[in-house]
């Protein structure tokens, strides 16, 4: 049954690269088999609730530009929003979706009312999932929008805010578990500081570590089989966030004994804000054993803030998927479009066309990455570059079997005098361009 919001638009289908239909896929064919799996199973696309159905189109200099019939804080409006959302997921053939609690339920007067409202909409979501076959990639709690969180959630100087946050996370984990979510995400938009003048860094680190440990403990208590994911971001809205980037989060996890329990949900826009490429963050997480999932979007490279735009750069996307595929692809994770329309894109069809374009770009990048994997030249180059470390003396150094004294004696005895070797960066860049 259609809501009428998208007019007479029918399900978006694959028409091929020569199609000029703006409401068709040109590169994303969910049934195309690549590296032994359907493209849908590789990419695991998800559509986010917040940017598509909650954001009103405002910016710091102007208010609402989107006119949506569900923009009311009532349960009736929340269910209408769900009807439109699941209709859009179905039109796009998006197998997954993601949400914050505050995206989907009316705001209550207190915690108990919030919980009742969330439980009611979860009942409705369960029905919609059954009807459509759409699944939940991950759920999360909004612990940043309400004024109570202005000084943080787990890192708040007020223990009552910490307690309220913990209780809210518990209800959101319950909701995610009930809906069969495959991950649970924590993003600490207010877990940081505006000024060090009023901040106790050690205290806040202890609080954040305790909260995340409780999340892991509760996961095991309720039998949630999905992954717990932390989403790094260096700043915005906070001046400085503690989960700055992949390497920083790993240090935090290690410090609190969670490195084997928690993985990362990495966003391209957040990587850019941290001064990294997206593939850097993915490769770092893979090297540290904490890669989980991705939010696919981009930032405007000239603006300097998180613009959350849909991806449109095939070479960037290809390198991201190359590093994902190189380590076996997604397990519980997927490709969530944490991207929003521009505030002038006010038509219902704009929502569809934005996702169609993003899905096509991801498909093009993914196919290029798969071709690079199958070709094997890049991987072999890296293997050959480090081949010297497979020799017995090199393995002994790496294994800690040789001291500095012993290594120094060997260098002198064997008159080791290494010569520089080309990194061949330009050759490798040309190689990548063959595929993208």
From Swiss-Prot:
Keyword ATP-binding in record: no
Catalytic activity, reaction form: alpha-D-xylose = alpha-D-xylulofuranose
Organismal lineage: Bacteria, Pseudomonadati, Pseudomonadota, Alphaproteobacteria, Rhodobacterales
E.C. number: 5.3.1.5
Stated name of the protein: Xylose isomerase
Protein family: Belongs to the xylose isomerase family.
Binding-site residues, Mg(2+) 1: 231, 267, 295, 338
Keywords annotated in UniProt: Carbohydrate metabolism, Cytoplasm, Isomerase, Magnesium, Metal-binding, Xylose metabolism
Signal peptide, first to last residue: none
Cofactor note: Binds 2 magnesium ions per subunit.
Record-listed Mg(2+) 2 binding positions: 267, 270, 306, 308
Active-site positions on this chain: 100, 103
Highest taxon listed in the record's lineage: Bacteria
Organism: Ruegeria sp. (strain TM1040) (Silicibacter sp.)
Record text on subunit structure and interactions: Homotetramer.
């Amino acid at each position: 049954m259609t809501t009428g919001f998208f007019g007479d638009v029918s399900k978006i289908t694959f028409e091929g690269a020569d199609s000029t239909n703006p409401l068709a896929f040109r590169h994303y064919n969910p049934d195309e088999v690549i590296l032994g799996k359907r493209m849908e199973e590789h990419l695991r696309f998800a559509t986010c609730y917040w940017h598509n159905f909650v954001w009103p189109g405002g910016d710091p200099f102007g208010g609402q530009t989107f006119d949506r019939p569900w923009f009311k804080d009532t349960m009736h409006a929340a269910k209408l929003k769900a009807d439109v959302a699941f209709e859009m997921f179905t039109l796009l053939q998006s197998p997954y979706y993601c949400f914050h609690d505050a995206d989907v339920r009316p705001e209550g007067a207190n915690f108990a009312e919030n919980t009742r409202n969330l439980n009611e909409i979860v009942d409705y979501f369960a029905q919609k999932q059954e009807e459509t076959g759409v699944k939940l990639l991950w759920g999360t709690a909004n612990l940043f929008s309400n004024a109570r969180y202005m000084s943080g959630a787990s890192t708040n100087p007020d223990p009552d805010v910490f307690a309220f946050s913990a209780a809210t996370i518990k209800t959101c984990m319950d909701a995610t578990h009930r809906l069969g979510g495959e991950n649970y995400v924590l993003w600490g938009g207010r877990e940081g500081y505006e000024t060090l003048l009023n901040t106790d860094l050690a205290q806040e680190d202890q609080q954040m570590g305790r909260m995340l440990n409780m999340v892991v403990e509760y996961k095991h208590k309720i039998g949630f089989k999905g992954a717990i994911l932390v989403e790094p971001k260096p700043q915005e809205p906070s001046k400085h966030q503690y989960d700055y980037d992949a390497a920083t989060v790993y240090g935090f996890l290690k410090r609190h004994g969670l490195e084997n329990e928690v993985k990362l949900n990495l966003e391209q826009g957040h990587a850019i804000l941290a001064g990294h490429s997206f593939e850097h963050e993915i490769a770092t997480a893979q090297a540290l054993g904490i890669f989980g999932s991705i939010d696919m979007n981009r930032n405007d490279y000239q603006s300097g803030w998180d613009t959350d735009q849909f991806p449109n750069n095939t070479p960037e996307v290809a390198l991201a998927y190359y590093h994902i595929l190189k380590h076996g692809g997604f397990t519980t994770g997927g490709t969530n479009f944490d991207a929003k329309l521009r505030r002038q894109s006010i038509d219902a069809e704009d929502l569809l066309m934005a996702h169609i374009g993003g899905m096509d770009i991801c498909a093009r990048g993914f196919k290029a990455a798969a071709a690079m994997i199958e070709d094997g030249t890049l991987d072999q180059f890296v293997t050959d570059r480090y081949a010297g470390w497979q020799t017995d003396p090199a393995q002994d150094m790496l294994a800690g079997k040789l001291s500095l004294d012993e290594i120094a004696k060997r260098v002198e005895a064997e008159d080791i005098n290494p010569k520089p070797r080309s990194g061949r960066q330009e050759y490798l860049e040309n190689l990548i361009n063959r595929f993208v």
